[in-house]
Amino acid sequence: MTFTFQSEDLKRDCGKKMSHQHVFSLAMEEDVKTADTKKASRILDHEKENTRSICLLEQKRKVVSSNIDVPPARKSSEELDMDKVTAAMVLTSLSTSPLVRSPPVRPNESLSGSWKEGGCVPSSTSSSGYWSWSAPSDQSNPSTPSPPLSADSFKPFRSPAQPDDGIDEAEASNLLFDEPIPRKRKNSMKVMFKCLWKNCGKVLSTAAGIQKHIRTIHLGRVGDSDYSDGEEDFYYTEIKLNTDSVADGLSSLAPVSPSQSLASPPTFPIPDSSRTETPCAKTETKLMTPLSRSAPTTLYLVHTDHAYQATPPVTIPGSAKFTPNGSSFSISWQSPPVTFTGIPVSPTHHPVGTGEQRQHAHTVLSSPPRGTVSLRKPRGEGKKCRKVYGMENRDMWCTACRWKKACQRFLD
């Protein structure tokens, strides 16, 4: 009994051991499998983390690169050279322009008496030494530059009260050898506006002024001056005046000095019937003597019309006191009109004999017109395209009427 019991116990123990070994082996296999799976999962997780980190790095790079301001493409060397060339050209043009190179002119340079008597006004500069001579004419007429003089030639004309601006005379003499740059002359043509109303011919400098003149004087509209239906545009035209010729004409005429004309009043004998023009010729030769540049006194009234008031010369009384012993004369300038009207009164009178009498010589000195003015004949206001065809048929008007000028189709 005991043996059987022990054998059964051994069998049970062996069976238990075998089962335990089998279970252990199974457990070991399962542990190995789980360990392998864990390793594989860890490797996969590691790879996933690596890929995620790489993606995050790429995203960060993209964000950073999008925020960085990329500088523009640099210019090529040729473009830089072209920019330098253009800048140099601009600088050279500015440095050689007459507006920059021309030195300032002293307006109050002292003049000697000889230049005043001669009528030429020297205009000097403080640094360059260029001199230019201009006749006494309008201030708007620029003087023509003359070749430079030496440094010693303009020393007497410098003002002692105004020293030079720190420039030595050696430097000034060096500047004299440079070629003077000719200054640009202003445009001498000036546009004026002439009234085309019959027997009017008034010339003004602005279109608004001539329109107001036509509206108020000729059309008789006294109401609102700003309101206009455009009718006055048909009664004026544009003309061009040469201001240089006007200034030359003004400079050629000078007022006669009362001291010369009153010093020796002309006495005339009794004229014969056959020699009536002799005193006039004498008076004319007397008036053409060298004239002084001194300012006219109260014995003279000098009336100078401007270019835009080019009307026929009108004799204006020179003084309210008229004495029969004076000789009146009038110098009239047709175009440009400059009218000098004066009555010189002689302070001393020669004794007049019974057989002598004084004459009032009226001499008119006229010179040919110098300004080339294209003046058209004033048209009448009877027939015009606007009045013939009407405002509604503008296509039938002539070109002048379409452009609001004087009618060219219906002439007087």
From Swiss-Prot:
One MF term in the entry's GO annotations: sequence-specific double-stranded DNA binding
Segments carrying motif CR2: 401-405
Zinc fingers, C2H2-type class: 193-218
Low complexity: compositionally biased ranges: 123-137
One Gene Ontology term from the biological process aspect of the record: regulation of transcription by RNA polymerase II
InterPro entries, per database record: CR1/CR2-DNA-binding_regulator, Znf_C2H2_type
Region feature Sufficient for binding to RE2 sequence motifs, mapped onto this chain: 318-412
Subcellular location: Nucleus
UniProt keywords, alphabetically: DNA-binding, Metal-binding, Nucleus, Phosphoprotein, Transcription, Transcription regulation, Zinc, Zinc-finger
Residue ranges of the region described as Disordered: 98-167, 255-278, 351-379
Short motif CR1, span: 383-387
GO CC annotations, alphabetized: nucleus
Keyword Metal-binding: yes
KW Chloroplast (keyword) present: no
Modified residues (Phosphoserine): 225, 228
Domain remark in the UniProt entry: The CR1 and CR2 motifs mediate sequence-specific DNA binding, and are important for binding to the MYOD1 enhancer.
Function noted in UniProt: Transcription factor which binds to RE2 sequence elements in the MYOD1 enhancer.
Protein name (record): Zinc finger protein 704
